Regions:
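Positively charged, low-complexity intrinsically disordered regions
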Residues: 20, 113, 117, 131, ...
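N-terminal leader/pro-regions and domain N-caps
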Residues: 22-50
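Extracellular/luminal beta-rich ligand-recognition
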Residues: 100-139
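Secretory targeting signatures
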Residues: 1-21, 228-236
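Non-catalytic, beta-strand-enriched accessory regions in extracellular/secretory proteins
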Residues: 42-73, 78-82, 92-94
Length: 257
């Protein structure tokens, strides 16, 4: 009976990891990415990545970059963790490149277009480049997305979809906020649509990603419980196995063949 319970626990942990594998692959920002020269590189913009960050004021700007071929599809979305203090947080998402234009975009979100020599952006557009800025102009609160593995919910904001990028080269995604309502808050930048998890990721990426997400949502109780279970459950299994082996040894000693 106890062996069955242990197997069931391992099965639940494994299937929970599988649920997360049907989602964004976490991409951590370790160093500063506060200008074009230090932009965080997205290895493959087609892979489904999730970047969890926080803007700390109207002058805080985050930069990301990726390489693409002509005709590639681009998908990017801003989501906000469902915490009441971020309910009105609506950061902007910009795409900067040499020849992108608002006409390349799909969808019905508010779009602003800038050349390098004009604009009210909190960053300077490099010479020879242009920027399109997609803002969220929908209802607040916006539609929600529930992530089952971490038991967390997000408010979905704007999407940026380009079915065919105009040229080969380096593209920059820039996240910033100039809102008069709320200029500080946490966001998730999702890029790409192809889910790409290996077996190794189940053990090297997914467990710490679960922990990081809980901290991102300021949930410090769940990690404490999870860590306690990781310590207690193996200990109980070990104690059970030791006792069982001891009983077998004593039985053989008392009733030798």
């Amino acid at each position: 009976m106890k062996e069955t319970i242990a197997i069931m626990i391992m099965f639940v942990l494994f299937t929970s990891s599988f649920q997360m594998a049907n989602g964004h692959k976490p991409l951590k920002v370790v160093d500063s990415n506060n200008d074009f020269s230090t932009a965080k590189e997205i290895p493959n913009h087609k892979i489904s990545w999730g970047i969890y960050e926080e803007l700390r004021g109207s002058n805080d700007v985050h930069y990301y970059k990726f390489g693409a071929d002509e005709g590639d599809r681009l998908y990017a979305q801003i989501s906000i963790p469902k915490l009441e203090k971020f309910s009105t947080f609506v950061p902007s998402l910009a795409l900067v490149s040499s020849d992108v234009s608002a006409g390349n975009l799909e969808g019905g979100y508010s779009v602003r277009e800038y050349a390098h020599d004009i604009g009210d952006l909190p960053f300077a557009i490099p010479p020879g480049m242009r920027a399109i800025v997609v803002d969220y102009n929908g209802p607040i609160p916006s539609s929600e997305f529930y992530e089952p593995f971490t038991q967390t919910s997000y408010w979905e904001r704007q999407e940026m979809v380009i079915n065919s990028l105009p040229s080969v080269g380096t593209y920059y995604l820039v996240v910033f906020d100039r809102s008069l309502v709320q200029d500080e808050g946490k966001y998730t930048l999702a890029v790409g649509e192809i889910e790409d998890f290996s077996l190794l990721d189940f053990f090297t990426i997914i467990p710490p990603a679960w922990l990081d997400t809980k901290f991102f949502f300021e949930d410090y109780v769940s990690p404490t419980i999870a860590i306690s279970l990781l310590v207690v459950v193996p200990s109980l299994i070990t104690i059970f196995l030791v006792k069982r082996l001891k009983r077998r040894y004593q039985s053989k000693t008392l009733h030798p063949r």
